[in-house]
Amino acid sequence: MQRRFDAAAGTFDSADFVFATTRDGLLARLEPISIDARYIIDLGSATGSAGRSLERRFKRAHILAVDLSQEMLQKARTKKTWLSKTAFLRADATALPFSDHSIDVVFANQLLPWMPDSAPVFAEISRVLRKDGLFLFATLGPDSLRGLRHQPFADMHDVGDALLGAGLRDPVLDVDRLKVTYENTASLVDDFCAIGARHCIPDEIEEMGLEPELDLEIIYGHCWGGGQRSAGGEYRVAAGEIGLRSR
């Protein structure tokens, strides 16, 4: 995965429409939340576009842009203004180099679809997040990319269960739908290549006779640090403990 993103660093911004859409959706959901933040992780920061918005929202905070791809981080550095307090760090989302309970906000825009298992990511976020710290994320739901990929994405309730099992509390989730239409299949393939995701669509896509469009189910969520982590790999939760955001 690191090699794919390194290769895509120079083209990512030209095809980041979905990332930009969900980034704006996350920032809109962040707006009414009141939290005093000193240290914020932009987890899976890619070329750093979210960091600039987070700096405007949290003017006194230090933004820590974390990504597995050194080339993505280098691209992000070129966007940094001289007044920026953003630091750039190459690290794995499942092994963050931060002390326990030292982070106020973790912002993760479309990181989870790239992870084979969300549980280690949630566990690590739970570890570094302070009590009453905020985890805010966007990911893809199971109705995304139907007909184009074989690996299913987790549904909203599975995501909520996994958050609670990792020791994150009071999750609130909502779902949005997004359709992206292309001029032709070749344009769709070009965009997937540009963001390092060519492996997500079949090699024979141009012979499949599919419409050149993407239907995406977007899951937005936020939750808080300081919950009880489950033991023994099992967690049971009443459906009412997973909040659904009013639309």
Task: Walk through the language-model features, giving the residues of each.
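A short SAM/SAH-binding and catalytic strip from SAM-dependent methyltransferases
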Residues: 104-117
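Class I SAM-dependent methyltransferase SAM/SAH-binding core
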Residues: 39-95
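A short glycine-rich, Lys/Arg-flanked "PGG" loop and its adjoining helix->strand segment in the class I
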Residues: 119-131
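Conserved alpha-helix/loop element of class I SAM-dependent methyltransferases that forms part
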Residues: 18-37, 53
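A short acidic, Gly/Pro-enriched loop at the edge of an enzyme's catalytic core
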Residues: 94-105
